[in-house]
Amino acid sequence: MPEPTRPLRPLLPLPDGGWQAMSVATPVDFKIRGLALVPPRSTVPVIVVPGIMGTNLRAKSKPRSREEENEEVNPGKPAWRPPNTTPGGLWDALVWDQYDPAYRQRLLDPDTLEVDDSGEPHIRHAQWGPHVHPQLARERWWGELHAGSYIDLLCMLETRLNQTFYRRYAEDMRRIRPHWQEVMDCDPAKWGFPHMAPLTEAELERHALHHYPVYGAGYHWLRSAHEASQRLEQRIDDVIDYWKAHKRKCEQVILVTHSMGGLVARACARRIPDKIAGVIHGAMPA
């Protein structure tokens, strides 16, 4: 009979290719051991590209000229960071209602702003523990994205893509996670794909051979999609290089986009198609 375990916080990658697990000291009569899930070596990063206004913006931290200095906020201070709660949104609506067009143009002057990665990720907790270590969320640029719009998606992808099977205590039997069972039970015809076969357990087994760390990729949505695509291209290169440096097999990423993020991803994919395994668009403009 398998012994009972308790889930530990998500692991932290080490430069030598290993993983670090954090636990706590317990009394000697507490016999339930901590369980850390070690990801596979093959890594396929998933990068979420938000829609227009979904990236936090701040005044440039180090303006190089007078023209790059924002007239309304100090260097490094937020210029666009929507609140993440309903009361906060109502309050912000009242505040912004007092701003006249001239003030808004000065505040949101594209030449004086940059992507702000210091937003609070607001990590959600799954039934069996946190979706991702808060330190990793910061390092993966989750703070660039508006949490109220995208944190649920980020957490869901991080958990569901990397949690495929499990073993229930007192049962020496592998089971499929409920979120994947729902996908298997779904009729593809309901989604407009009548000729597609439902997902199989064999396909899930192949899926589980890879690690899917989830990243954010904000961009300066007041500037052109071309500039945003260049930033995304650099983000893809940085992520792939990171995992290779940590002795992981990593050649391609998957992009998950929303709205204007789809246009950014398409422009990027034209230049580096070999580094993108696939793109999943959500509500992309025509």
What kind of region is each of these model predictions?
Residues M1-V256, M260-A286:
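N-terminal non-catalytic accessory region
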